[in-house]
Amino acid sequence: MLKQKATLTRRQLLSGSASIGTAFVIGIGYVAGSSAAWAMEVTHLKPQTMATLIQMARDIYPHDHVADEFYAAAVKGYDTEEQADMIETGIAGLDAAAQGKGFANYAETGWERHRVDILRNMENSPFFQTIRSGLVTGLYNQKAVWPLFGYEGESYSQGGYIDRGFDDINWI
């Protein structure tokens, strides 16, 4: 009797089992979201480093209703020749800290509280501060994210908040 060869379809691969945290490496130089609705090319960082950076961004500014693609766009700016060494070294330190607590690496640390613990231990480091401060503008300046928070954008060009309804927000 011939044994049936086990196969893995593209759909099965993309639907989940290969994910690392919120993002996973799909090939040399590429990172994709666990939903496979987005992917990004990396040129100066390792794809695994970018996947970990995306998870780190999500842990620093957690929003369940914000998709991974926005976090990926927020950290894409670190994929430069000038910052590659600092990012690779910082992520290696993050992974080492996770391994010191018994996890395979930071991105594969299953519980958010364990990842946040690791981040709290390094929150005063220049690496953490660089990522955290860059995320403030990298994440929240994306116009596509604004509606997710109920922000309608600036009002000056439309007559200001007084003429536009300065008290129409429903999230406070």
Functional labels for PLM-detected ranges:
Residues 2-24:
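N-terminal secretory signal peptides and thylakoid transit peptides that target proteins
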Residues 4, 41, 102-105:
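Residues marking the start of alpha-helices
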Residues 7-8, 25-61:
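C-terminal segment of N-terminal export signals and the immediately downstream linker at the start
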Residues 9, 46, 67, 110-111:
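Helix N-cap and loop-to-helix transition residues
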Residues 18, 22-25, 61, 123, ...:
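Hydrophobic/aromatic-lined pockets within catalytic cores
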Residues 52-55, 69-172:
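Mature-region segments of soluble proteins
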